[in-house]
């Protein structure tokens, strides 16, 4: 039996809601809505529909970057993501915390900066007041509680420097 690819592609494989969701939340449409709420989003940016962004006015993303599915950007403080950066699915970017030295636990809003050409792999946690240097790779499931140097590869809980990232020519 041969597979009929054309028939399969024309068949409705998803619920009507899934098709409506895909139309309503295309990258361009979602980016436009985020911009209307104050986000600064570059050209050719892909932000998946299941991404949660708490405060669009505290978000800046450079050209050609992508934010994966089910990513949580808790941006009480400003979150800046550089150009050609990839934030994979289910990443938690947490630009909010509390001052645990104060009995009242006041809310703090430190910034997070993610550099150009970085790759934040799936299920990673980026803590408050962290800078991910240009070209760095943060391995899947990593917990970042300290800055990452440019062009470094990091992994683990807590994150540890693994090696230098060297691009092939």
Model-derived features with residue positions:
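A short acidic, helix-capping loop that chelates divalent metal ions and anchors anionic groups
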Residues: 100-103
């Amino acid at each position: 039996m041969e597979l009929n690819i054309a028939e399969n592609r024309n068949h409705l494989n998803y619920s009507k809601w899934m098709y409506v969701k895909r139309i309503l939340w295309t990258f361009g449409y979602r980016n436009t809505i985020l911009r209307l709420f104050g986000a600064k989003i570059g050209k050719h940016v892909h932000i998946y529909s299941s991404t949660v962004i708490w405060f669009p006015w505290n978000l800046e993303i450079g050209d050609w970057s992508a934010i994966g599915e089910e990513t949580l950007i808790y941006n009480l403080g400003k979150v800046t993501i550089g150009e050609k950066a990839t934030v994979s699915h289910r990443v938690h970017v947490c630009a909010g915390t509390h001052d645990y030295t104060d009995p009242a636990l006041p809310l703090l809003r430190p910034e997070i900066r993610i550099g150009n050409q970085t790759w934040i792999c799936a299920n990673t946690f980026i803590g408050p007041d962290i800078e991910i240097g240009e070209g760095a790779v943060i391995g899947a499931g990593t917990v970042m509680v300290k800055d990452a140097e440019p062009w470094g590869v990091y992994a683990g809980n807590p994150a540890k420097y693994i090696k230098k990232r060297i691009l092939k020519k």
